[in-house]
Amino acid sequence: MRPIIINGRFLLHRTTGVERYAREIIAELDKAIPAGSITMAVPPEIENVPVYQNIKVIKTGKFKNRLWEHISFPWYVHKQKGISLNLCNVAPLPSPGIVCIHDVKIKATPQYFSKKFRLWYEILFGNATKRAKKIITVSEFSKSEIVKYFKVDPDNITVI
């Protein structure tokens, strides 16, 4: 089985609902898995690296911010022959792996977002919904919206 590598870039952000979801899922995973079976990769600029009992955390890459997420992180996943687990809406363009899409408000209520923001997230979500090995989401409603706006097979989406 390929190793699972969590995208830890969310640790750079202030905690909102999306980041809290990621932290809670990871905390529960940590309790449920054998030691060393999952790794979390984080950007080098993270100062307070979380400590888990069973999840190994590793600083990797030379880039920062989005470049880390779309270059350094997927490169690390590739070198480890792993699969990425992306819990905060965004997955690397080169290899989305498993991605959690919390909502698709950019499609449902586009008037609330700038054109630039919508375009960026439409690219990210479009890539993830077409190429991800698995999509997870937070509710049946979000699942139905992903199916509606991105024409995803509902069997490829799991609600957690």
Residue map of PLM features:
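Carbohydrate transferase catalytic cores enriched for Leloir-type hexosyltransferases
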Residues: 1-160
